[in-house]
């Protein structure tokens, strides 16, 4: 290291600390390590800035030399492993910790809370540990606490502290999510919330009893266990914006408005509006009316099978469609009216009509997929009818093309159960194969833009898969409602951190790849002060580079590990 003194055109001298090195071709190069400022400005702080920083350069050179010096470690062949000693450190945790502190501002949030409430534990540290556990190796809260020795920060809290913290996190969940959103906008600029994607899923519990929150409902996994519903919002870039939890027996269609209120997108400042994009299960009169009255927009899919006779006829009519050159896609639209019911000041519901744009399209890919799926169901239905072992309880989705008729065809004799294949329903479904319909308030939006916006729902479906799979959100190992709610807050924060990591690595890697890479950055204790690391990939380099740290070193001291963890708490440079 040496001090470079650069004379500027304004006559002032600028100081920088520079490091010399040789490039791959053997040529001498120099890189700027630190920009210091003008000498005359530094004289207000140092008597002799040049002498001071020349001494600093010598100190940094000596430190760099010591860091590159060979390390010798001796092991005894008789040495035994301590049963209670932890010989590993998961330094990959530094990457998500950087996002928690720099982008989501969790330390600042809890510091503000600290002045109003005394803590016997550090809620920020506990949350950091639980989020890392979700990302690297999802487990119970107690198991995460037991593995705290591998976390690269001191975790001097008890298991009871963790459970007390869960209650505290639940009490402050709404404020924390709002604070994270504000911090994210401060660090990365305004978020694109012009389109908000919304969907609902549920999570099962390995218990038998309902308790008012964990309730039996329509399980996505077709399990009889009690479930909890989660509604999730994503912004236009696919980043989580907010969520809400509901009892398991809550109908999906009734969750949108409470979730919008929780996310703060119902009472927006004058002139601001969002367009809510959701599937057909959310396409209800109440949701459409609320969006219109709030000054917001909507893009909802519409079931062709359950549509009115007029809408179904229009969708299936070839007239008006614009077909692609390949013949694999066709589209048309029209301005129409939709009846909705609005509660008046007297509390009575009144029927009103609102103008809507209906976009119909047909896709060969969708057609082929629906044909394959329908063929499987038809085959099961025919086989079930041939066996004659159907009951009314069995005539559901797997055999939905079997119907019970009151008389035997041909003889006219009465029969308690006479199952036949419903050929008319098969033909009707074949006619609708590949057709989709979308209803929207955005009359000026291009038809293809409407479809593209609707297709963006795959991001939220994939987010649910990540939460349930890679982040291990189910089955939930908590039992009280406050702890269950805190568990999903941790999962939500882990998902948001994961999405930011994917964004900063060009969306090239899956959540599973990132989790595996970070979990692999584990150091093994060689002696009291040295850790040996043996895992490095292009992905770990990209993740570390995104937050400005170096995870490529094979040997690190405890002090160097502490320094890395301190660096990720500092603001982004």
Regions from the PLM with identified roles:
Residues 1-125:
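Conserved glycine(s) in the ABC-transporter nucleotide-binding domain "signature"
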């Amino acid at each position: 290291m040496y001090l470079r003194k650069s004379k500027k055109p304004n006559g002032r001298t600028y100081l920088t600390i520079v490091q010399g090195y040789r490039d791959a071709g053997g040529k001498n190069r120099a890189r700027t390590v630190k920009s210091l400022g003008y000498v005359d400005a530094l004289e207000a702080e140092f008597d002799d800035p040049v002498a001071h920083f020349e001494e600093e350069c010598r100190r940094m050179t000596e430190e760099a030399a010591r860091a590159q010096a060979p390390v010798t470690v001796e092991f005894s062949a008789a040495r035994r492993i301590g049963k209670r000693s932890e010989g590993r450190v998961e330094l990959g945790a530094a990457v998500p910790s950087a996002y928690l502190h720099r982008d989501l501002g969790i330390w600042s949030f809890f510091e503000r809370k600290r002045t109003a409430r005394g803590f016997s534990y550090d809620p920020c540290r506990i949350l950091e540990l639980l989020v890392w556990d979700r990302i690297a190796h999802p487990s119970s809260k107690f198991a995460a606490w037991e593995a705290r020795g591998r976390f690269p920060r001191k975790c001097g809290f008890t298991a009871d502290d963790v459970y007390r913290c869960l209650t505290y996190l639940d009490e402050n969940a709404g404020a924390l999510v709002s604070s994270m959103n504000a911090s994210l906008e401060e660090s990365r600029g305004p978020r694109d919330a012009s389109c908000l994607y919304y969907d609902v899923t549920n999570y099962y519990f390995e218990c038998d009893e309902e308790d008012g929150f964990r309730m039996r409902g329509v399980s996505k996994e077709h399990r009889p266990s009690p479930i909890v519903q989660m509604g999730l919002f994503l912004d236009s870039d696919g980043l989580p914006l907010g969520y809400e939890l509901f009892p398991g027996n809550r109908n999906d269609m009734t969750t949108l408005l409470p979730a919008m209120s929780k996310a703060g997108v119902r009472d927006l400042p004058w002139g601001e509006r969002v367009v809510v994009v959701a599937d057909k299960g959310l396409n209800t009169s109440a949701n459409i009316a609320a969006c219109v009255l709030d000054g917001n927009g909507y893009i909802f899919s519409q079931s062709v099978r359950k549509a009115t006779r007029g809408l179904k006829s229009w969708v299936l009519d070839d007239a008006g469609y614009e077909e692609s050159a390949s013949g694999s896609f066709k589209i048309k639209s029209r301005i129409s009216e939709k009846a909705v019911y609005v509660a008046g000041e007297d509390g009575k519901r009144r029927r009103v009509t609102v103008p809507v744009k209906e976009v119909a399209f047909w896709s060969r890919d969708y057609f082929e997929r629906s044909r394959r799926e329908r063929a499987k169901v038809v085959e099961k239905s025919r086989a079930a009818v041939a066996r004659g072992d159907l009951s009314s309880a069995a005539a559901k989705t797997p055999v939905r093309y079997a119907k019970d008729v009151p008389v035997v065809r041909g003889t006219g004799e009465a029969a308690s159960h006479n199952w036949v294949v419903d050929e008319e329903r098969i033909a009707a479904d074949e006619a609708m194969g590949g057709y989709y319909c979308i209803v929207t308030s955005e009359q000026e939006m291009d038809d293809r833009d409407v479809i593209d916006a609707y297709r963006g729902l795959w991001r939220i479906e994939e987010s649910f898969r990540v939460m349930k799979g890679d982040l291990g959100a189910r089955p939930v190992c908590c039992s009280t409602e406050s702890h269950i709610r805190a568990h999903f807050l941790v999962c939500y924060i882990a998902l948001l951190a994961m999405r930011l990591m994917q964004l900063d690595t060009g969306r090239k890697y899956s959540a599973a790849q990132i989790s595996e890479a970070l979990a692999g950055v584990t150091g093994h204790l060689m002696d009291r002060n040295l850790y040996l690391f043996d895992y490095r990939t292009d992905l770990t380099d990209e993740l570390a580079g995104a937050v400005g740290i170096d995870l490529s070193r094979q040997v690190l001291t405890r002090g160097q590990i502490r320094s890395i963890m301190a660096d990720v708490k500092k603001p982004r440079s």
